[in-house]
Amino acid sequence: MNGNHSAPAIAIAVIDGCDGLWREVLLGIEEEGIPFRLQHHPAGEVVDSAWQAARSSPLLVGIACDRHMLVVHYKNLPASAPLFTLMHHQDSQAHRNTGNNAARLVKGIPFRDLNSEATGEQQDE
């Protein structure tokens, strides 16, 4: 889903070739059916890069990642206030749900809990 540069897509700034580390996030975006476009950068600050990516995306959502952190930003938020921040050491379900939530921001539907499993069933605790 990341090959067509003319279709509206979530812009993802990949800093220092780290996209392989965040595969679950990309799969979460794909699960929701929203296209994304990878933009490789040799260096940069993650929060600012995510905000710049959101500004460049017609979908108003941008993501940036380095080897330690991934940030989801929305164009209408202040540059210093990203919507979601994910650390690499968090579990794969949090990674997948962050991708789902970036796509859900585009769709305008409720977010998933970052730590819940996406089974489609509600659990009472």
UniProtKB/Swiss-Prot annotation:
Top-level taxon: Bacteria
SUPFAM superfamilies registered for this protein in UniProt: B12-dependent dehydatase associated subunit
Reactions listed under catalytic activity: ATP + H2O = ADP + phosphate + H(+)
Cofactor binding annotation: One Mg(2+)is bound by the enzyme, a second binds only to the beta-phosphate of DdrA-bound ADP. Co(2+), Mn(2+) and Ni(2+) can substitute in vitro.
Presence of keyword Metal-binding: yes
Keywords: Chaperone, Hydrolase, Magnesium, Metal-binding
GO MF, any single term: metal ion binding
List of residues binding Mg(2+): E31
Signal peptide: none
Quaternary structure, from the entry: Component of the DDR complex, a heterotetramer of DdrA(2)/DdrB(2). The DDR complex interacts with the diol dehydratase complex in the presence of ADP but not ATP.
Family statement: Belongs to the DdrB/PduH family.
Purpose of the protein: Small subunit of the diol dehydratase-reactivating factor (DDR), which reactivates suicidally inhibited adenosylcobalamin-dependent diol dehydratase (DD, pddA, pddB, pddC). DDR acts as a chaperone, reactivates inactivated DD holoenzyme in the presence of ATP, Mg(2+) and free adenosylcobalamin (AdoCbl), by mediating the exchange of the tightly bound damaged cofactor AdoCbl for a free intact one. Reactivation takes place in two steps: ADP-dependent cobalamin release, and ATP-dependent dissociation of the DD apoenzyme-DDR complex.
UniProt protein name: Diol dehydratase-reactivating factor small subunit
Gene designation: ddrB
